[in-house]
């Protein structure tokens, strides 16, 4: 017999001896407490124990948990069983959940264009950057918790939940451990998981709460204080890693958290009667990906099976019999009496009315088949989607009856308040949310509207509380925390041509008047470019027709190649532009604009030659009409899986505009992505461009992006007219690792200057690549083989393209 089992039997015997000293009419049996530790994704291992408790029908009287243990414990306390929690964990997209912003397809157009272009985004108080209190504000997490706990949000004392529970947190202000026993259950769940620097702290009165695992990751003492006589604890954290295993940022963070509370963890471990420790070797607190989650749950089930003998001993030592939703109570010689009656899950029908409809009273004999019949009759009224019950033994003569209902009818909103909005007016938020008093409360629809408003970029968090008003009415209290009007964005990009390029972008909302926005961006190092844009999309970022004005200065290198594909010179492509126009916006996927532009070109070679005709200098003043249109419903800018990006642009410079060089050019391209069987992605890109014969050389097409064309090097293709097609296959090797196969070819080329058209051969290329998604953005390596020049069909070359970061130009 192993030591933990001996310890459990000894503890149970002591309790039984104590209980035997009580009178035969004693109302009490030994109370069982459940403790679930923190551990990030490792906390999913708790599901194995919860399912084992369900299958053995062991009643839990108290629950205390920290971090992920607090979340699963709270949900178990309000009626989610182990199987339901397993499905919830497996069906949740945890990676998306930990990103605050809506999916790209739901962002407003202007926010969509800024997303995934910069590594760092800061709010600015005045002109000083204000770093966030955590990498994740927890917006989506908060809304998920609110949806899951909605029927119990009117219960303010956690002792009144179906199973009394506690969530453990730490107050950053005082440094004290905080045991949350009342208030909003969803907010308590959010507080206990607020890992410092990862998640923003939660304001709770005068406190700032973070993950309780810092001080008490295995809160056995908390559940003992609640009244537990027997404690079952599941520990998935607080193991100090050896030196050779501390080899990642997550391991360093995990080790740091574990060190702070190691002494209390050791003390609490000794106080547990059943201590279950899943073997999670090789897994980390950050393993929120599908295959890792499955492995963690599997390992948790394995540990629960290993503890099954001890749990069975506990069950029969306490004479618990069949107790969870039973149709028989085998441990009782005669029907026990109902000592307490609790009804949960109702949001519209008052308790008093349900109590009368049920017709069961404390003191009545507990006959499960009779209770089942009453619930069948209750459901037959048409008021309920589902009903159920649990019978929890209290003593050898008494039980507690827990009735669970899920109503057909949803409550109506009696009133709405909004607080925390200092800059955004009540009416603006009220109109954006689109909910009114008298509406039926649909938490899923409410969450969608909140995320739509959140996508505007004005708020750090938006959450809500629901207060029951009785008689199928609730009061909705919405709490917002605004972000400053100013934003600062920082980005880095590296590729084999431009080398390092840095970007600093500034955004100012509501400049002078509500809805007027100013964007400015400076790119420097590998190229120099400044853009500034003043426009009026309105506060809701969806004004169908809006005015804009912009300016741009650009100084970028351009490589010049001869007919053999050899670089013979480089130019500085300098231009200064100012323009104004009107934009057209349809929903968040289609955008078009027309602008009148004045552009000053100053193009000069980087070499000095006595014969200026070889590499001339151009200084031209151009006046242009520019028309652009694009459709964008890609699901991701960095690594698209599905969707279409289509872009059209026309540019014309006419004598009537008093321009130095008249010309016209037009281009269109479509980029289509489709993913099948989750790992296989096919991409089809088609590009077409045509221009007038006298197009100035600085307006030619230059290939400058290996994501469009491989084979030739940067700028080796310089044409008036060009059309090409690209086919790409991408395979996901792991969560952030992809293999790529690429092939492309031109099918139309045209180059005309002073000489007649050249006889051009088509340009082709194929390649293989690896893409890795890192914290700094995608890392791309592509090895290609392809044409060296359109003028020499027999010339081919091998190129290696490397880039990392967020491409912002």
Regions inferred by a protein language model and the residue ranges of each:
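Sec-dependent N-terminal signal peptides
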Residues: 8-17
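Periplasmic polypeptide-binding modules associated with outer-membrane biogenesis and secretion
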Residues: 294-297, 304-493, 505, 519-536, ...
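Patatin-like phospholipase
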Residues: 23-66, 74-376, 380-385, 391-397, ...
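C-terminal segment of classical bacterial N-terminal signal peptides
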Residues: 17-23
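Bacterial N-terminal signal peptides that target proteins for export
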Residues: 1-9
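C-terminal outer-membrane beta-barrel translocator/porin domains of Gram-negative envelope proteins
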Residues: 618, 622-757, 794
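Gram-negative/organellar outer-membrane beta-barrel architecture
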Residues: 421-434, 439-626, 631, 701-707, ...
